[in-house]
């Protein structure tokens, strides 16, 4: 260790060495020896106890080719059976055909067994257990939803729910919903059952009007209740516009009527015999949980199939 005392000792040794050489008559040789000793002492000090400024420069300067470099840990590519979302997810807008809709497409390989890590948009439960809240809709939440005064339900008749759900990553996450006040408690019961059954949900978030009307990328997968929009392909209000219907994992549970498939890239999930996580299936937990509160399922429709859709009226 190079201390101030050590430096003084080194200087004393240098003076002593120089003096001894002068007494020997070799003044020049003594000076050279002193210089060598001084350089050695200073080199030892700088390498053993660099100043904070020098240390900072050493850390921030480019490393030598053989030195290890520090780097941040990347986001996990896999958690349990779930993987990170493809970088292109939600970015590739589909072309719209003459009928004003995008054509159904083959499911990309990355989404044929879709199990994506959930990105927390609300704080997850600290204890990993089920929790839920029901309250009047805060003004800021209403403002970022699709609700307007033209919707068929008053804002005072809606409730804001936070609900814990199980992700495809096996973790507990917190989602949010807008729902009609008269079904809010029933929905808490349903999602509590799904959580207890480890039924996975990818995302549960309130959509804005802009999000609902955005050009389709065909790969969305948001579970939600309220959406102020008409019935698909019709002018009348959807049950979602009243807060009386749930779309559950739309990608794993697509809508199909003739050639129309929504989401458009979810065609792999039209094969209901190929059971995969997150799918609503007859006589299984998701369908049973909604049936227990008296709700119907779009998978039972005859003229079309709407596997994601559960509603209080059955329509």
Task: Give the positions of each predicted feature.
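Basic/polar, acidic-poor N-terminal "presequence/leader" segments
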Residues: 113-118, 132-169
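N-terminal post-signal-peptidase region of extra-cytosolic proteins
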Residues: 140-149, 172-181, 228-234
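Catalytic cores and adjacent binding grooves of peptidoglycan-active enzymes
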Residues: 86-111, 230-315
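N-terminal low-complexity, Pro/Thr-rich disordered segments
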Residues: 28-32, 39-140
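Sec/Tat-exported extracytoplasmic proteins
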Residues: 134, 165-169, 191-198, 230, ...
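N-terminal export and membrane-targeting signals
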Residues: 3, 11-35
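Mid-length scaffold segments of soluble, non-membrane domains
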Residues: 192, 198-202, 216-230, 234-250
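Active-site acidic/histidine clusters and adjacent loop/turn architecture
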Residues: 150-218
């Amino acid at each position: 260790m190079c201390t101030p005392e050590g430096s003084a000792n080194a200087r004393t040794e240098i003076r002593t060495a120089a003096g001894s050489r002068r007494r020997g008559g070799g003044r020049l040789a003594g000076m050279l020896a002193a210089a060598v000793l001084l350089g050695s002492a200073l080199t030892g000090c700088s390498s053993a106890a660099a100043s904070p400024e020098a240390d900072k420069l050493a850390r921030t300067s480019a490393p030598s080719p053989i030195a290890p470099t520090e780097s941040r840990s990347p986001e996990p590519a896999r958690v349990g059976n779930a993987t990170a979302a493809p970088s292109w997810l939600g970015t590739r807008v589909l072309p719209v055909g003459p009928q004003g809709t995008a054509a159904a497409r083959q499911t990309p390989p990355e989404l044929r067994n879709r199990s994506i890590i959930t990105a927390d948009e609300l704080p997850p439960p600290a204890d990993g257990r089920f929790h839920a809240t029901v309250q009047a809709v805060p003004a800021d939440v209403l403002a970022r939803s699709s609700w307007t005064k033209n919707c068929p339900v008053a804002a005072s008749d809606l409730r804001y729910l936070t609900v814990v759900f199980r992700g495809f990553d096996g973790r507990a996450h917190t989602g949010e919903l807008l729902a009609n006040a008269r079904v809010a408690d029933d929905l808490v019961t349903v999602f509590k059952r799904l959580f207890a059954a480890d039924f996975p949900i990818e995302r549960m978030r309130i959509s804005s009007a802009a999000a609902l009307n955005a050009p389709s990328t065909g790969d969305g997968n948001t579970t939600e209740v309220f959406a102020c929009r008409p019935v698909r392909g019709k002018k009348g209000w959807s049950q979602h516009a009243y807060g009386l219907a749930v779309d559950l994992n739309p990608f794993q549970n697509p809508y199909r009527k003739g050639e129309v498939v929504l989401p458009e890239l979810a065609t792999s999930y039209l094969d209901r015999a190929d059971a995969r996580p997150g799918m609503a299936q007859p006589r299984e937990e998701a369908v049973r949980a909604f049936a227990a509160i008296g709700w119907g399922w779009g998978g039972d429709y005859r003229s079309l199939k709407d596997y994601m859709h559960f509603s209080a009226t059955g329509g």
